[in-house]
């Protein structure tokens, strides 16, 4: 197991040199403590070299990963004596390590010590003053000159015959008050950096505390307790024991009675400031430390467990044991990282774009996946079906059966069509003649504009389906296609062009459907209500209204249909078994009689005008023969009388000849007055016959509109599916191949996105690092 620490060193070099952070949480010993507590002196004593920067205020401003590597040494007998980094026996290692720290024999051929920095790996430093200068320069380069700190570590390796294999991480000392141009939050920055390292489960905390201060105020122990409350991975170091007050000692602390730690405390005596100024050598400093513990009355009994050599040996053994304990977990974590990174790399795709034939295959596969995804989304066979909202073909179904149907059903068949409009159309369709029957021309004139109301929802339905297909097109690319932005854009544009091409005939066909319905009004359609059905509805409604009115007025209820002509023919019977059809049949037999009645009632215009002026209501009542006469044509005098209703007091011949005949108000009749009478003729209060005509037209329009609406609701989705949706599905594959599969397009379309390319290369680097780390661990585990 002697190679465990070098193994961790290799892993540290690997991860910091490639990734820049310890993603494996490698076992390490982290040195923490307050500013000027003696951390630097402890490290220099362990190394046996004076190499760390010194000064006032905060000096260590970046983490220093210090890797101590023991070099083999040769004796005069030319025997290779292996360094005692990780011996199987603690007794053997103790003797060897003590010798390593205290120097070598005078008769040995000393090997020159040297240092290396990870950021300049090809440079060896044999002068420790230059090492100190490089640490200062590198700190200044990254952390700046304002005494601020930086999390990027400095990796330093020291090769020496006087050291044990050991790795330590020196962190900035915790300071309370910023001095000079230090940031005002320097304490928070330092604390955050320290917590980042000591909170890792695989780190051993080396808490340095000065013995000449109360241990309960130790910042290092306070920080350690915050992450290791039971003290299982904290080892305490007491410095400056030689500076304690006379008559006092630290035996209670060293024995664990004051502040118990599982790993215990180790006492050290470092060089004082005067020793540093006088350039006291490390060998002399270690000799003075050993002499102090041997002759001190309180510490002489535990001298074997005090001093820098014992601390180095303890830390080395502790680190080896910690590595051995954590190595299986590290290997398992590494295996997980390799698997995850490999999966992530697979998601980015392993494209061999250098091979021209492979480029063609990649392009064809991308087009096939795009087309298949587009079709599957419409058919509902997509592998990624969302559960939170409708998508693909389900949205098309919703458009047809919810949006489109609701829009059509919400249209009023008589929208924008007033009673005056209907009456005017009826009058205009009859021309200058009186009407005998209900005008079919008026029905045609009125119903065609109403059918055109169906066009707008149909057009909107086509547009909505087109928009949904465009959305499906934009979401049809998979992760592999997204790696090539230009290819994805070309695929979307090609399919968009196809959809636009299919949109035009679809739009035209839907317009033709509306035009077809307006081109021929099929009143013989079996679902059309017809005149008889419309008459039944109108009469039924009038009867219901009459009954309701009679009940409100408490009048005797007698059927309004019990009307008998003067000749004794009963047209309307109160018998409920009498149908509208029988009534109509009776009415057709009377048409000849009605015509003769009309002839008999023809009178000169002036007489009619006089009669209407003198007794309009009695005349109107007298002219009513039967209710059917209002539908199939009464006497012609009714229409003629209405045409001169407003001007009945003016003899027409006198008015036109400029006579002096005046109205009862003595206003002369003018041509403009006659014109106004003609324009407002349709606005007059309608007779009962005219009301029936209007109601019949309304019922017929409503019936035919509903009939046409059902046809449109059924046919428009079929047209859209055939000409737009299915046509696009059938043609998408051939269109993509014919437009994009060209060798001169390969270089243009298969250009990877820079971000994707960068991420894939990063994954490849990570995977390489993980595999190398796994290979390193496999050498010993």
Curated annotation (Swiss-Prot):
Q: Where is this region: G1 motif?
A: 33-40
Q: Where is this region: Disordered?
A: 76-103
Per its UniProt record, what Gene3D superfamilies does this chain match? Answer: Dynamin, middle domain, P-loop containing nucleotide triphosphate hydrolases
Q: What does the record give as EC number? A: 3.6.5.5
Top-rank taxon of the source lineage equals Eukaryota
Q: Name one Pfam family in it.
A: Dynamin_N
| All copies of domain Dynamin-type G, residue ranges | 23-328
Q: Which GO terms describe its cellular component?
A: cell division site; cytoplasm; membrane; microtubule; mitochondrial outer membrane; mitochondrion; peroxisome
Q: Where does GTP bind?
A: 33-40, 170-174, 239-242
A GO BP entry is: intracellular distribution of mitochondria
Primary site of residence: cytoplasm
| Positions of the UniProt region annotated as G2 motif | 59-61
Membrane topology, as annotated, equals:
Peripheral membrane protein
Keyword GTP-binding listed? The answer is yes
| Record's subcellular location | Cytoplasm; Mitochondrion outer membrane
Query: Any idea which GO molecular function terms this record carries?
Result: GTP binding; GTPase activity; membrane scission GTPase motor activity; microtubule binding
Identify the stretch(es) annotated as G5 motif: 269-272
Keywords attached to this entry: Cytoplasm, GTP-binding, Hydrolase, Membrane, Mitochondrion, Mitochondrion outer membrane, Motor protein, Nucleotide-binding, Peroxisome biogenesis
InterPro entries reported for this sequence: Dynamin, Dynamin_GTPase, Dynamin_GTPase_CS, Dynamin_N, Dynamin_stalk, G_DYNAMIN_dom, GED, GED_dom
Region (G3 motif) residue ranges read 170-173
Where is the stretch described as G4 motif? Answer: 239-242
Residues covered by the GED domain: 694-781
The task this protein performs is described as:
Microtubule-associated force-producing protein that mediates mitochondrial fission during interphasic growth and at cell division. Fission of mitochondria occurs in many cell types and constitutes an important step in mitochondria morphology, which is balanced between fusion and fission. With vps1, acts redundantly in peroxisome biogenesis, which is under cell cycle control.
PANTHER family associated with the record:
DYNAMIN, DYNAMIN-RELATED PROTEIN DNM1
- What is the protein name given in its UniProt record? Dynamin-related protein dnm1
